[in-house]
Amino acid sequence: MKIKGMDKFHEHLPDYPGKKIRFFARLSAISAIVGLLFLVVMDGVFRLLLSGDLLILFSPFGPIFGVGIIEFLGFLLVYLFWKKKDKLLEKLANKAYQKALVYALIGIPWIIILMIHIYFPIDLIIPISSMDSITKLLSRSITEIFVGVNILDITIRSIFGFFLLFVGLRTIFRTLSIFGLDYMGLVYVYYPEESEVQHHEIYSIIRHPTYFALFTLALGGVFIRFSLYSIIFYGMLICGLMIHVLYVEEKELIIRFGDSYRDYQKKVPAILLRPKDIGKFMKFLLERSF
């Protein structure tokens, strides 16, 4: 199946003709594996190395430190993709995007791995000892803490969580099919003169459907796990994404489009659907006009 915008995307990678483009897929895969391994290690490293009072003191912070480090580095690399634009264009011209894409394809997989990480318990590899009571408390579902294990609760949360997972994935696939890999791959951040203004109706209800998808994907994990850790991880992810959207991407859009984009910001929410627009959004997912 041919991906929309693939030709335009590939056109801006002049040193990677034909199958050489697979380098970027391998780079993303390696980045994701490294990020995942780091998170798994940080989830249990203090439980593995420490004991006694030191275990009780430091173990609860291991998973949080792991998420914080990967999130910081991931968003930093994505920021560098935007930050280095002018210098790279001046120095490399038509190869600027190709050079910058390396930053994005290391950073973005780490952000995606953070979302996947929310779906899994922190003791998946290294068990929590009986004396590590704070870590155990943070990793248990909130309902389990108060009412014990309840099959109905687990079932309802799982159904809703997997529904959100489906909505997030479906939103990404719909966005990709409509706008193409060239837009999703941020080619026109570097070459805006080649782009076309997008007028799809989805932009009348939400400014950043892709980021909405990422929020929804991660929220599905929160409902499935429903632990204090999952809520903390989700909060950290929201903060990182919002800082990036508001102070990196939208700053660039304001420079490009000026007051017209500021007016658009006032009329349409960035990543949260208004209740009145839920029906329209579902039509978008089902490939129907509003």
PLM regions and their residue ranges:
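Conserved beta-strand->loop/alpha-helix structural units within folded catalytic cores of enzymes
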Residues: 214-215
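Active-site-proximal inter-transmembrane loops
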Residues: 187-211
